[in-house]
């Protein structure tokens, strides 16, 4: 018997597991492959517009993503630095090896937390309340609370060209039966889609034909509780290239060969992260589109071709990649593909992320219809906190829209619902001038302390900052300035 079972070891599952275990509750994290804990199956980055502020909020509440990004990144920069403070946020290139390794260490070193390799095929529900799970190896495990964080693995299909087969990211085994179990208990599901671009061999790129994109020249960090110590001059650069008329012609001449336009895909994809086919078809007035060449690992030789998600067959992916500057001789190491998966109708959730239909059942991440590691981690943290608070017979943590981007995210999911994978944007937050990068700790650390995830050491750091701000404010209020008219002085 565990107090909490978390199903899925992605970013939502990791934050949920850590939150429950650190609050003292016996927690079982079940994942199909322990090697894929906190995996980044798509872009090798943490943060971005609005998302970077969410990572700061996760950190302020006691989550792990922010600190892990700080100690795992290849480069980091402040986006929108020339614009107003309401839209500034951090984005880093994360090392796809180091980030998961650090997360696994944190999980293994956390008391009350057990990790098990298996897949869940059925929920045990009695009188509309969770009792436990049955795994695909037919093991029954009891629990008081269950948090589902299956990401894109639920009844997943991989699609490329005219080919379609069951599979999760990286060819991993999908979760084939849990979706049926959820529907059997009255949970409404929907079909969504996302995709990933090809990867190319670093040594096969002609970087002289590309534009270099460096990290910022000042020390930056997601975490509010640690000083950054990385070497600014050793940040790994990204590079920028563009599609062109040849690229566009190849796509337009072969739309019938890609999964997206051949009718093979039924799931709805993310509006704000479209495939390259969608970009060319929907924005025919554009002569070119930005393509980012992003390193996946410090010591690896694979480059992520950002902005080039595709469902074209392999031979056409070769032609498309070779049509762009810097990539004429590029060697593709992994081909792009789309993935379709089942997701819960988020209108069936409470603001606590607990199911309205099944007591003790929570869900977080892409199963709730979101896209992005940051949105997933934020939901996982809140679901973990609220499952724990429920075990303690306490009221759930409900963040308001004027308190946090996390509050905007959850409120949108629960009260507006989604028809496509949801992505956080600054434009979604009507209080964005209050929900800034620089004040995430001032907004949320007291809440993190109250729910039991901010320890004494972190709280001391926070209180010292608050006292210093107060002293500075008092100093400014008590300081007078005499303005001398320059003309009178002459």
What label would you give each PLM region?
Residues 328, 381, 387-388, 393-490:
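Non-catalytic terminal regions with compositionally biased, polar/charged low complexity
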Residues 136-145:
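Core beta-strand elements of the Rossmann-like FAD/NAD(P) dinucleotide-binding domain
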Residues 1-12:
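Beta1/beta-strand and adjacent pyrophosphate-binding region of the FAD-binding site
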């Amino acid at each position: 018997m565990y107090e909490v079972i978390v199903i899925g070891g992605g970013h939502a599952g990791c934050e949920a597991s850590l939150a429950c275990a650190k609050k003292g509750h016996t927690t079982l994290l079940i994942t199909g492959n322990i090697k894929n804990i906190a995996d980044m199956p798509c872009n090798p980055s943490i943060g971005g517009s609005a998302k970077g502020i969410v990572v700061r909020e996760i950190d302020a509440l006691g989550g792990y993503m922010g600190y892990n990004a700080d100690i795992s990144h290849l480069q980091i920069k402040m986006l929108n630095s020339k614009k107003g403070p309401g839209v500034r946020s951090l984005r880093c290139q994360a090392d796809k090896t180091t980030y998961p390794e650090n997360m696994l260490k944190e999980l293994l070193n956390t008391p009350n937390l057990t990790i098990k390799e298996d897949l869940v095929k059925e929920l045990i529900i009695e009188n509309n309340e969770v009792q436990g799970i049955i795994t695909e190896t037919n093991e029954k495990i009891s629990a008081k609370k269950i948090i589902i964080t299956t990401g894109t693995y639920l009844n997943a299909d991989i699609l490329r060209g005219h080919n379609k087969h069951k599979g999760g990211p990286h060819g991993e085994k999908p979760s084939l039966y849990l979706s049926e179990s959820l529907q059997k208990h009255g949970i409404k599901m929907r079909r969504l889609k996302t995709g990933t671009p090809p990867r190319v061999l670093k040594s096969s790129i002609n970087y002289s034909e590309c534009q270099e994109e460096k990290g910022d020249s000042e020390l930056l960090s997601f975490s509010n509780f640690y000083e950054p110590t990385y070497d600014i001059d050793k940040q790994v650069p990204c590079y920028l290239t563009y599609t062109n008329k040849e690229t566009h012609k190849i796509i337009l001449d072969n739309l019938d060969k890609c999964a997206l336009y051949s009718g093979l895909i039924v799931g709805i994809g993310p509006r704000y992260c479209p495939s390259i086919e969608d970009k060319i078809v929907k924005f025919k007035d554009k002569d070119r589109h930005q393509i980012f060449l992003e390193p996946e690992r410090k010591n690896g030789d694979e480059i992520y071709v950002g902005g080039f998600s595709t469902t074209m067959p392999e031979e056409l992916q070769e032609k498309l990649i070779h049509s762009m500057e810097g990539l004429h001789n590029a060697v593709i190491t992994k081909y792009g593909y789309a993935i379709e998966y089942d997701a819960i109708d988020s209108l069936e959730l409470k603001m606590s992320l607990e199911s309205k239909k099944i007591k003790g059942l929570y869900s977080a991440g892409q199963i709730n219809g979101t896209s992005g590691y940051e949105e997933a981690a934020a939901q996982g943290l809140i679901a973990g906190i609220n499952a724990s608070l429920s075990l303690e017979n306490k009221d759930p943590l409900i963040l308001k829209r004027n308190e946090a981007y996390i509050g905007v995210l959850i409120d949108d999911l629960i009260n507006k619902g989604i028809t496509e994978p949801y992505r956080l944007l600054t434009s979604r937050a009507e209080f964005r001038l209050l929900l800034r990068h620089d004040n995430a700790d001032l907004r949320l650390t007291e809440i993190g302390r109250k729910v039991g995830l901010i320890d004494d050491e972190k709280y001391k750091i926070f209180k010292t900052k608050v006292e210093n701000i107060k002293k500075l404010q008092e100093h400014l209020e008590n300081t007078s300035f005499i303005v001398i008219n320059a003309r009178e002085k002459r």
